[in-house]
Amino acid sequence: MSSDCWTPFHARLHQLLQRRSLLPTRSRLLLAVSGGQDSLALVQLLRGLQPHWHWSLAIAHCDHGWRSDSTANAEHLRQLADQWQLPFYCQRSPEPPRSEAAARTWRYQVLEAIAADIDAALLVTGHTASDRAETLLYNLTRGSHLQGLASLRWQRSLSDRLTLVRPFLGFTRAETSKMVQQFQLPVWEDSTNRDRRFARNRLRLEVLPQLRQINPQCDRHLANTAELLADEADWLAELTEQVYQQSLSERGLCRSQLAQQPIALQRRVLHAFLQDQLQRSPSTVQVEELRQLITAPQGSCSSSLPQRRVAVVAGDWLRLQSVDD
């Protein structure tokens, strides 16, 4: 089907982009494309909307080298880009990343470099409401604070010059499947997406289908929950920063001020304090240990923290010091 054929899917995305101001007119967009159904559906809709928004579109593909068919996958996308008359950029990892986290880090480094080379201010991915639901469930199973449950935002800054945008969070994976059929898109199936050794794949292939039997709209409802949590997380982050700055001095954190705050806010302020002091995200156990020190007697201290440091009570102040002091 031609990209200039206007469908209800195009209309929905057009209205969503207007409402959320995600992809401004005449922007240069770098589209991260794997070849799967979500990213190809994204390209198809954006190509259809391009005459209305006057974007400059380019495709980027990151080849992790994990699969025997990864080179063929990249060539398939190169041919599609030629067919669509879009610039195509591809980079293969020097060696296969050892974990999903390492792959993600490498992938975003590559995409940021490509975006800088072509002067693109927006990196666009095909993450859907189903991905958001999956991420919410995944973080719940691991135990997560509010910020983790509110992950996969509509947009987030990657650097001073590049913003990641996810315009497909308004669609489910079932809907992108319908797009693939309607537009007859040549999807390249990634066999690793069906490998049940990965926790996310088990959620996608086993858990979410069971939840859909309880409520067929669970993907969208879970994604909406993540959206609500994101708004609350933003508000709490502002409040936390305000209380943190009010409680902080050269002597440490003021215990009497913290004692007046709700427990949830105490935890968030202490988390921010430890992260600033240690330059790493503290564990829940470490935060709780410090919270007990808010009302502890003079001279009390925590167990050892990273960098051979401990938290100690000094009058009305809670501060970190070296275990050697």
UniProtKB/Swiss-Prot annotation:
Subcellular location: Cytoplasm
EC number of the protein: 6.3.4.19
Binding site for ATP: S34, G35, G36, Q37, D38, S39
Superkingdom in the source lineage: Bacteria
Record's function text: Ligates lysine onto the cytidine present at position 34 of the AUA codon-specific tRNA(Ile) that contains the anticodon CAU, in an ATP-dependent manner. Cytidine is converted to lysidine, thus changing the amino acid specificity of the tRNA from methionine to isoleucine.
Name of this chain's protein: tRNA(Ile)-lysidine synthase
Annotated organism of origin: Synechococcus sp. (strain ATCC 27144 / PCC 6301 / SAUG 1402/1)
Catalytic activity: cytidine(34) in tRNA(Ile2) + L-lysine + ATP = lysidine(34) in tRNA(Ile2) + AMP + diphosphate + H(+)
Gene responsible for this protein: tilS
GO cellular component terms, semicolon-separated: cytoplasm
UniProt keyword annotation of Ligase present: yes
UniProt keyword list: ATP-binding, Cytoplasm, Ligase, Nucleotide-binding, tRNA processing
Domain free text: The N-terminal region contains the highly conserved SGGXDS motif, predicted to be a P-loop motif involved in ATP binding.
GO biological process, one term: tRNA modification
